[in-house]
Curated annotation (Swiss-Prot):
<keyword id="KW-0963">Cytoplasm</keyword>
<feature type="active site" description="Proton donor">
    <location>
        <position position="161"/>
    </location>
</feature>
<dbReference type="GO" id="GO:0050661">
    <property type="term" value="F:NADP binding"/>
</dbReference>
<keyword id="KW-0560">Oxidoreductase</keyword>
<feature type="binding site">
    <location>
        <begin position="8"/>
        <end position="13"/>
    </location>
    <ligand>
        <name>NAD(+)</name>
    </ligand>
</feature>
<keyword id="KW-0028">Amino-acid biosynthesis</keyword>
<dbReference type="InterPro" id="IPR000846">
    <property type="entry name" value="DapB_N"/>
</dbReference>
<feature type="binding site">
    <location>
        <position position="34"/>
    </location>
    <ligand>
        <name>NAD(+)</name>
    </ligand>
</feature>
<dbReference type="InterPro" id="IPR036291">
    <property type="entry name" value="NAD(P)-bd_dom_sf"/>
</dbReference>
<feature type="binding site">
    <location>
        <begin position="99"/>
        <end position="101"/>
    </location>
    <ligand>
        <name>NAD(+)</name>
    </ligand>
</feature>
<dbReference type="InterPro" id="IPR022663">
    <property type="entry name" value="DapB_C"/>
</dbReference>
<dbReference type="Pfam" id="PF01113">
    <property type="entry name" value="DapB_N"/>
</dbReference>
<dbReference type="Pfam" id="PF05173">
    <property type="entry name" value="DapB_C"/>
</dbReference>
<dbReference type="InterPro" id="IPR022664">
    <property type="entry name" value="DapB_N_CS"/>
</dbReference>
<comment type="function">
    <text>Catalyzes the conversion of 4-hydroxy-tetrahydrodipicolinate (HTPA) to tetrahydrodipicolinate.</text>
</comment>
<keyword id="KW-0521">NADP</keyword>
<keyword id="KW-0457">Lysine biosynthesis</keyword>
Length: 263
């Protein structure tokens, strides 16, 4: 049985992840962390029913991970929190599933450095839904055939999302750019902005949109639009818990959803 910890346990994604841990076989909740609701039963906070796992202060993470015999921590928080959590989790010899987005290059290096230094494993992905990772593969294939077309990415999310563009939009841009040997990214346009051989990236924020990503390949006289829509955050939570089960048999190092889907 895999013992899983959840950071941001009181949050929207934290609660969904806990629900999915309860539903899946081969994994159980062993620890939960947050800055609020400390000492409360996490099941009551998540409204899943009493689980006999209390929410712990993140300041006590190292001790709690050891005492609870946690094998893997699932982290969907914010970039500064994940950067602070990663060295603690890796230092305790515990694997990590990271769904946080919006990292700077320096923050990403800090996280990966902690994992490599401690010989643990991590899956780092901007999106854990199976559908969106198939979406990336479709974009890769399409770009091979439409390399001369203009490429624009439009993403839309709820009005509380903290980072823009989304990690998924950036991953889509990177996949296309790598396929085409490198492209500049342009974020929105204003004023006189003649188009060059670039990938345009645009962010929309409004209402309760879970996550829409559209990639437009536009040529003379025609265009192709490839779109992924998330109807529920449960697609992300379910994929993250499956990744936590998968990583139990993975070797040390940094892994992606490509590794999981390909195995």
């Amino acid at each position: 049985m895999i013992n899983a910890g959840v950071t941001g346990a009181s949050g929207r994604m934290g609660k969904l992840i806990i629900e999915n841990i309860i539903k899946m076989e081969g994994i159980q909740l062993s620890s939960a962390f947050d800055l609020m609701n400390i000492g409360k039963d996490v099941g009551e906070v998540a409204q899943t029913g009493k689980l006999d796992v209390n929410i712990s202060d993140v300041a006590d993470m190292a001790t709690v991970l050891k005492e609870s015999k946690t094998n893997v921590v699932i982290d969907f928080t914010i970039a500064p929190a994940t950067v602070a959590n990663a060295p603690v989790v890796a230092g305790a010899g515990v694997d990590l599933i990271i769904g946080t987005t919006g990292f700077s290059d320096e923050q990403r290096a800090t996280i990966e450095g902690a994992i490599i230094k401690n010989g643990t494993s991590a899956v780092i992905s901007p999106n854990y839904s199976v559908g969106v990772n198939v979406f990336f593969k479709i974009l890769q294939e399409t770009a091979k055939y439409l390399s001369e077309y203009d490429i624009e990415i439009i993403e839309a999310h709820h009005n509380q999302k903290k980072d823009a563009p989304s990690g998924t939009a950036m991953k889509a841009a990177e996949v296309i750019s790598e396929t085409l040997g490198g492209k500049d990214f342009v974020y929105g346009r204003e004023g006189l902005a003649p188009r060059d051989k670039e990938i345009g990236i645009h962010a929309v924020r409004g209402g309760d949109i879970v996550g829409d990503h559209t990639v437009l390949f536009a040529g003379d006289g025609e265009r192709i639009e490839i779109k992924h829509q998330a109807h529920s955050r449960n697609a992300f939570a379910s994929g993250a818990v499956k990744a936590a089960i998968w990583i139990n048999n993975a070797g040390p190092g940094i892994h992606t959803m490509d590794d999981i889907l390909g195995s």
